[in-house]
Amino acid sequence: MSEEKKVVLTREYVVNLRRAYEVSRTKRAKYAVGLIRRFVARHLKVESKNVRIGQALNEVLWMRSIEKPPRKVRVVVEKLSDGTVKVDLKNV
């Protein structure tokens, strides 16, 4: 039987993705996903492999193709009881 995962911590961040524009155009959106993973892992003290990116956030990052991700995004981060972290787009 699987145990119910409870939310231990919830935070909101504005992640600046400006550094993604320092990478070549054909790698920017993928690099932006990595930037978010590393940012969240650093701030919540978990490994980056335990960070899960939500579908809505992923679609926003890739919406204007691989060459033009957004400059910054507002995210909601939830740390679960099993140590994984969910990152989703903040509903405005």
UniProtKB/Swiss-Prot annotation:
Annotated gene: rpl31e
Sequence similarity: Belongs to the eukaryotic ribosomal protein eL31 family.
Keyword Disulfide bond (UniProt): no
Keyword Ribosomal protein among record annotations: yes
Keywords carried by this UniProt record: Ribonucleoprotein, Ribosomal protein
Protein name from the UniProt record: Large ribosomal subunit protein eL31
Entry GO MF terms: structural constituent of ribosome
GO cellular component, one term: cytosolic large ribosomal subunit
Superkingdom classification of source: Archaea
